Every structure is written in structure tokens, then in C-alpha cells.
């Protein structure tokens, strides 16, 4: 019983405790909730108060900013209004000034018009008086006014011309004496310092033979060897009774040199047949190319002219195998360079420019038989192509009078060219005319389409033309020969007759392996 009571009491106590705890916790919770609500309300009230304060401050700031802007705008408007008023005032003042000036101009214009009328009236009166006076003078003197003017002008012109001619003659005489004296000194000094050998070139070369039996081997079976050599080189081989010698005849020194070297190699080798001849001619061409380059380099070194394009060096070397009226063109060019340089040093001109232009002045002659135009025009094109200066091109272009010299160096090159050419024994006219005729003959042949190369042989009595087989067939050869003959008759003067031989060759080459 006691146990049950105890349990009941415990249960009741626990229930009371739980209930009491519940109410206590509830009161505490309600108290905390009340505090939280009060705090939240305070925060909200404070936030409302703060936001109203901030809003009022922002509104106040905005009003102040607007007031500031309005004040600034009003100030700017006042300033602009003031400026506009000032500008309007200046415009009004200018208009008033212009109005006054316009009134003055109108007044002056009226005055000028009146004065002009008075002047015109006076001029009319003067003209009437002059006419009356002239009529009186003409009636008294018996001549018209135009005739009197003509007489006065004629007499005055005659007197002035006489005085001018006397003065000019005296000045010219004095200038010529001084110029002749100075030029003789300069030219004499230049010639004295320059001593160049000039060998008169011929059109034949003699090749020595070890024995006369070699002549038969050179001719070959049915003449095939000699024909092959003549066809490949364009040179005539003359084999006569001259002991142990063969004569090479041709107007082109380069071809003669190729033929000479090839023939000497064939003689030394001993094997002479068409295939070997072709091989030796090709080797000779390469050897002559090297020799030409050496000649050009030697000429540039001898004249102290540096920086020349390699192609111009090669063309300079070719001039060693060209002649002008029998004068070796390369040696002539070297001599012109030396003389022009010496004269330039004497008068204070550009020595390097004078030497360079003197050395290159005849460069066009290296290819003038291959290109159209004078050697001066060809030379100018070559120098432009290989980037020579305008001064050098101008100086070389004037040496034959085709262009007016604009520089002292151009005059010096022209003078040096004339000095070198005019030296006694330097040139021979007849050989040059003969060579030019042969060059013209080859030029006519090469002007036709389909012609590969041509050679003037037999002292110009025969022209041998090699044509391209793919361009000209057998039927067209006869027509080409007839046309070429007619053109030679029309354009060339020559003694006797010229044989036109056209060769069309087709080769088929295969190699057995």
C-alpha cells in the first residue's frame, strides 16, 4: 500500500512538475517573445525614423544640387546674354562703319566719274591737236610719221648693232685666246700622260700547222670537216699553197678567236671529225667567254673604275674583239677614260664620274649588231638595266652629239672621245666600211622569222643562214631565199654579187646503252 502510494505520489509529483515546468517555460517563452517583439518594433521604428531622416537628407541634397544647377545655368545664360549683346553691339557698329564707307565710296565714284569725263574730253582734244600737228609736220617734211619712225629706228638699230658687233668680237677674240691656250695645256698634258697601244685589226688569222699533211685531215672526207667547222663558227677556212698554215677569214673577231682556239685544239689532239669538231668548238666558246671576262676585269682595274655590274664587265671584254675604223674599241675606251679623268683633275671636275663614263661610253658597240638602235641608245639601255647612275648615263649619251651635254663631265667625255679617235693612225676608214657592210648583211638575214643564226663568209660574197626546222619547211626555204635576196638588193650596196645559202638541218640523236 505504501509502495502504491509512493508511486502515485511520484506520478502526481511528476505530473505537477511537468505542468509547472510547462507553464514556467511558456511564461519564459512568452516573455522572450514579448522582448523580441518589442526589440523588433524598436528596430522597425528606428529604421522608419532613419529612413525618413535619410530621405529628408537626400531630398535636401537634391534640392541643393538643383538649386546649384539652376544658379549655374542662370549665370551662364546671363554671361551668354551679355556676350550676345556685346556681339550685337559690335555688329551694329560695323554696319554703321560700312554704311559710312559705302557712302564715301559712292561719293568718290561720283567724283571719279566726273573726273573721267573731263579726262576723256581732254584726251579727245589732245588727239585732235596731235593729228593737226602731225599733218602740219608731214606737210612741212614731206614724209609720213610712220616713215619717220622707221628711219629713226633703223638708224638707232644700225648704230647699236655696230657697237655690239665690235664689243662681241673683242670679247670673243679674248675668250678664244684664253680658252685655246688653256685647252691646249689641258689636252697636251692629258695626252702626254696617256700612252696607249692601238693595233689595227685585220679580218684574217693564221694558224700554224705541224706539217702539210694536216691540211688534208682538216678538210676531211669530201670536205665534211671543213664544212662543219665553217658552219659552227661562221668563219671561212682558206687552205691554199701557203706551207704549214691555214688562214681563218671573217669580220667578227670573236668568231675568229673561237675558230682559232678550236682548230689549234683539234690539231694538238689529232682526232678531227665532225663530232670532235663540235666538242672543241663548244670548249673554245667557253674559253673565249673566260678570256672576255678577264679583258673586262683588266680594263676596269687599269682605269680604277670599281663596282661595275658583272654583265657590264663581260660586255667590256667583248669590246676587245670589236673595232671602230680599225681602232680596238676596248683600248679606245680605256684611253678615253684616262684622258677624261686627267682633264677632270685639271679643271676640278668629278674624276671618278669622268673615268666611269669614259670607260663605258662605247658599251653599246658590244651588242649593237644584235639589237636595234644606235650604239648610244643601246648603251643607255644597258646602263639603265644594270643600275648605273643618271650622271654616268648622261655623260656617255652625249659623246656623239645625240644629246645636249648638261654637265662638265659629259663635255670631257665627248672631248676625250674625239681626241682618242682623231689621233693620227688611230683609225682606218676602209676596214670599218667593209665590216659594217658584213654586219648589215647578217642583220638583214636575222630579221626574218625562223632564222636561227647567220654568217657572212667569203669576204661578204656569201651569206649562210641556219634556219629552225620546226619553223620553216623545205618548200618555204626557196621563198625565203628569194625574199632575202630582194631585200639585200634593196638595202645594201656591194660589189659583184652575194650568194644566199639557206641550210635546214634535222637531227635525230639517240644513245645506245
From Swiss-Prot:
HAMAP family for this protein: RNase_Y
Family: Belongs to the RNase Y family.
Superkingdom as given in the UniProt entry: Bacteria
EC number: 3.1.-.-
Annotated HD domain residues: 329-422
TM regions (residue ranges): 3-23
An annotated GO cellular component: plasma membrane
Localization of this protein: Cell membrane
Keywords assigned by UniProt, alphabetized: Cell membrane, Endonuclease, Hydrolase, Membrane, Nuclease, RNA-binding, Transmembrane, Transmembrane helix
GO molecular function: RNA binding; RNA endonuclease activity
Membrane topology: Single-pass membrane protein
Domain KH: 203-266
Originating species: Clostridioides difficile (strain 630)
Role: Endoribonuclease that initiates mRNA decay.
The protein, known as: Ribonuclease Y
GO biological process: mRNA catabolic process
Primary residence: membrane
Amino acid at each position: 500500500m505504501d509502495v502504491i502510494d509512493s508511486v502515485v505520489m511520484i506520478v502526481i509529483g511528476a505530473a505537477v512538475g511537468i505542468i509547472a515546468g510547462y507553464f514556467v517555460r511558456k511564461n519564459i517563452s512568452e516573455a522572450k517573445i514579448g522582448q523580441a517583439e518589442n526589440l523588433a518594433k524598436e528596430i522597425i521604428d528606428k529604421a522608419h525614423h532613419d529612413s525618413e531622416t535619410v530621405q529628408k537628407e537626400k531630398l535636401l541634397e537634391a534640392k541643393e544640387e538643383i538649386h546649384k544647377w539652376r544658379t549655374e545655368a542662370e549665370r551662364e545664360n546671363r554671361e551668354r546674354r551679355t556676350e550676345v549683346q556685346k556681339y550685337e553691339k559690335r555688329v551694329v557698329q560695323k554696319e554703321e562703319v560700312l554704311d559710312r564707307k559705302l557712302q564715301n565710296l559712292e561719293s568718290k565714284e561720283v567724283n571719279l566719274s566726273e573726273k573721267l569725263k573731263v579726262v576723256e574730253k581732254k584726251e579727245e582734244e589732245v588727239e585732235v591737236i596731235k593729228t593737226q600737228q602731225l599733218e602740219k609736220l608731214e606737210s612741212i617734211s614731206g614724209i609720213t610719221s610712220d616713215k619717220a619712225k622707221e628711219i629713226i629706228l633703223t638708224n638707232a638699230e644700225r648704230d647699236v648693232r655696230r657697237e655690239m658687233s665690235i664689243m662681241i668680237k673683242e670679247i670673243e677674240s679674248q675668250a678664244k685666246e684664253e680658252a685655246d691656250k688653256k685647252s691646249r695645256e689641258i689636252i697636251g698634258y692629258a695626252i702626254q700622260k696617256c700612252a696607249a697601244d692601238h693595233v689595227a685589226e685585220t679580218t684574217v688569222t693564221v694558224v700554224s700547222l705541224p706539217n702539210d699533211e694536216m691540211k688534208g685531215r682538216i678538210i676531211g672526207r669530201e670536205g665534211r670537216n671543213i664544212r662543219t667547222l665553217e658552219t659552227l663558227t661562221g668563219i671561212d677556212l682558206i687552205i691554199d699553197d701557203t706551207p704549214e698554215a691555214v688562214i681563218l677569214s671573217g669580220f667578227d673577231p670573236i668568231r675568229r678567236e673561237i675558230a682559232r682556239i678550236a682548230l689549234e685544239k683539234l690539231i694538238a689532239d689529232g682526232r678531227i671529225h665532225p663530232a670532235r669538231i663540235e666538242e672543241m668548238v663548244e670548249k673554245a666558246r667557253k674559253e673565249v667567254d673566260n678570256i672576255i671576262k678577264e679583258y673586262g676585269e683588266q680594263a676596269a682595274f687599269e682605269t680604277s673604275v670599281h663596282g661595275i655590274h658583272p654583265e657590264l664587265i663581260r660586255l667590256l671584254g667583248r669590246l676587245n674583239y670589236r673595232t671602230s675604223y680599225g681602232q680596238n674599241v676596248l683600248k679606245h675606251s680605256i684611253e678615253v677614260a684616262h684622258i677624261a679623268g686627267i682633264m677632270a683633275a685639271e679643271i676640278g671636275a668629278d674624276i671618278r664620274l669622268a673615268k666611269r663614263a669614259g670607260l663605258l661610253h662605247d658599251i653599246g658597240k658590244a651588242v649593237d649588231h644584235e639589237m636595234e638602235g644606235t650604239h648610244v641608245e643601246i648603251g643607255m639601255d644597258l646602263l639603265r638595266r644594270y643600275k648605273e647612275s643618271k650622271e654616268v648615263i648622261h655623260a656617255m649619251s652625249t659623246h656623239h652629239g645625240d644629246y645636249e651635254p648638261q654637265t662638265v663631265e659629259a663635255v670631257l667625255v665627248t672631248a676625250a672621245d674625239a681626241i682618242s679617235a682623231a689621233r693620227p693612225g688611230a683609225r682606218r676608214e676602209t676596214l670599218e666600211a667593209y665590216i659594217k657592210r658584213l654586219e648589215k648583211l647578217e642583220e638583214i638575214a636575222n630579221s626574218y622569222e625562223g632564222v636561227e643564226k647567220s654568217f657572212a663568209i667569203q669576204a661578204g660574197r656569201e651569206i649562210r643562214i641556219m634556219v629552225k626546222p620546226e619553223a620553216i619547211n623545205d618548200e618555204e626555204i626557196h621563198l625565203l631565199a628569194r625574199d632575202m635576196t630582194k631585200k639585200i638588193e634593196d638595202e645594201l650596196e656591194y660589189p659583184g654579187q652575194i650568194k644566199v645559202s639557206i641550210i635546214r638541218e634535222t637531227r635525230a640523236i639517240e644513245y645506245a646503252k
